[in-house]
């Protein structure tokens, strides 16, 4: 069997001086971080603040909700199924730092419909004493893997709706509330607000068999990069010396790029995933929702923008950073050098594995072929 993408990254044996220098720089940076010389203040304080989490009834979304509740946040979860929401909200309450002081709410909604997202934000604002939520974290969506040609056009559209449009609709609804300008007489100091997308490393490195899913995640990443620039127009309005009409608070965008996550959705995905796809990602060790949530929250607390949850994902990000903002110019530059060297071998190997699979097994006849 040919090596998979992650195994190539893991098993690479750098011998050239340039690669050794990159590893040395990364090792030094890691030591510095471990000993706290570059410690930063928490940029994601959630105690007493209201957080909306879409897809919060299970998987990563539920884990995020539980961990933010542990930190003292008021939690609103959104999903379609009432029973799952009711069960999840009890688990989230059980994780609360102070269940008598914190507040919890759930809303059943179809996020593929923009009017539903508007309804959610209106309902949360009323529930939150007339104030919009402070943080919105988009975790909704599921993956339907398959070969592009073997997948129906309707499924391709459904994946774009479920993955991209649920996030875009949610972002549009909350930003239209957050970014309404107010007069100077009504302006008062407010903590920074946060909009968080949950994407996938497939937005960095597409893999055969994810044709319905990867384009939607790539679109989400493009939206995030665009908003990261556009939001500065509104943040800049608050820096005006005249303090004319401006938005009430600064807003920061973050995007999380997990790999496999052990969840009910992952189990369903595995049942229909092409065998070639499983081979290509065989060394990808899925993480638990709790682990992904913890790593993501810690990264947001450090103020990071594009967030990966394991080393392989970091290397994949390094190969596709392009013009995206860096978390650390030093670390991301070093990772980018390493990634570009590694992917000189990775990309040809992915294509070779696909070719050899076709030579051995012939034309696929179903999404699970």
Swiss-Prot record:
Give a yes or no for keyword Secreted in this entry.
no
Under Gene3D superfamilies, the record lists:
NAD(P)-binding Rossmann-like Domain (3.40.50.720)
**GO MF, one annotated term:** 3-dehydrosphinganine reductase activity
Motif (GXSXG) on chain = 55-59
Pathway as given in its UniProt record? Lipid metabolism; sphingolipid metabolism
UniProt keywords (A-Z) are: Endoplasmic reticulum, Lipid metabolism, Membrane, NADP, Nucleotide-binding, Oxidoreductase, Sphingolipid metabolism, Transmembrane, Transmembrane helix
Please name the catalytic residues of this protein. Answer: 213, 217
Extract the InterPro entries matched here.
KDSR-like, NAD(P)-bd_dom_sf, SDR_fam
Q: Mainly resides where?
A: endoplasmic reticulum
Residue ranges annotated as coiled coil are none
Q: Which GO terms describe its cellular component?
A: endoplasmic reticulum membrane
User: What does the record say about its membrane topology?
Assistant: Single-pass membrane protein
Cite the EC number: 1.1.1.102
Q: Where in the cell is it found?
A: Endoplasmic reticulum membrane
Q: Which residues bind NADP(+)?
A: 52, 110, 213, 217, 261, 263, 272
This protein's source sits in the domain of life called Eukaryota
Q: Which reaction does it catalyse?
A: sphinganine + NADP(+) = 3-oxosphinganine + NADPH + H(+)
Q: What class of enzyme is it?
A: oxidoreductase
Residues crossing the lipid bilayer are 195-215
What role does this protein play?
Answer: Catalyzes the reduction of 3'-oxosphinganine (3-ketodihydrosphingosine/KDS) to sphinganine (dihydrosphingosine/DHS), the second step of de novo sphingolipid biosynthesis.
Record-given protein name = 3-ketodihydrosphingosine reductase tsc10
According to its UniProt entry, this protein's organism is Emericella nidulans (strain FGSC A4 / ATCC 38163 / CBS 112.46 / NRRL 194 / M139) (Aspergillus nidulans)
């Amino acid at each position: 069997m040919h090596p998979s993408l992650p195994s190539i990254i893991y098993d690479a044996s750098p011998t050239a001086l340039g690669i050794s220098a990159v590893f040395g720089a990364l090792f030094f940076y890691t030591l510095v971080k471990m000993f706290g010389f570059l410690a930063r203040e928490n940029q994601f304080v959630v105690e007493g603040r209201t957080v909306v989490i879409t897809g919060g009834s299970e998987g990563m979304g539920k884990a995020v909700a539980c961990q933010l509740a542990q930190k003292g946040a008021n939690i609103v979860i959104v999903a379609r199924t009432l029973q799952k929401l009711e069960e999840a909200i009890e688990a989230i309450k059980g994780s609360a730092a102070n269940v008598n002081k914190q507040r919890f709410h759930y809303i059943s909604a179809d996020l593929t419909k923009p009017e539903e997202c508007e309804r959610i934000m209106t309902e949360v604002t009323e529930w939150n004493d007339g104030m919009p939520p402070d943080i919105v974290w988009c975790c909704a969506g599921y993956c339907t893997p398959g070969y592009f040609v073997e997948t129906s056009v309707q499924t391709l559209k459904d994946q774009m709706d479920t993955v991209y449009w649920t996030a875009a609709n949610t972002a549009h609804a909350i930003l239209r509330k957050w970014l309404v300008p107010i007069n100077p007489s009504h302006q008062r100091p407010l903590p920074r607000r946060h909009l968080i997308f949950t994407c996938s490393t497939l937005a960095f490195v597409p893999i055969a068999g994810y044709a319905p899913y990867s384009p939607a995640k790539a679109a989400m990443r493009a939206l995030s990069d665009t908003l990261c620039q556009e939001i500065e127009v509104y943040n800049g309005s608050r820096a005006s010396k005249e303090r004319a009409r401006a938005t009430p608070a600064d807003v920061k965008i973050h995007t999380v790029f997990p790999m496999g996550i052990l969840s009910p959705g992952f189990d369903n995905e595995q049942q229909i995933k092409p065998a070639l796809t499983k081979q290509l990602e065989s060394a990808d060790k899925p993480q638990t929702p709790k682990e992904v949530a913890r790593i993501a929250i810690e990264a947001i607390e450090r103020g990071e923008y594009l967030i990966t949850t394991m080393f392989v994902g970091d290397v994949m990000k390094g190969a596709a950073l392009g013009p995206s903002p860096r978390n650390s110019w030093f670390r991301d530059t070093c990772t980018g050098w390493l990634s570009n060297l590694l992917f000189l071998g990775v990309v040809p190997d992915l294509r070779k594995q696909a070719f050899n699979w076709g030579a051995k097994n012939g034309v696929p006849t179903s999404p699970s072929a």
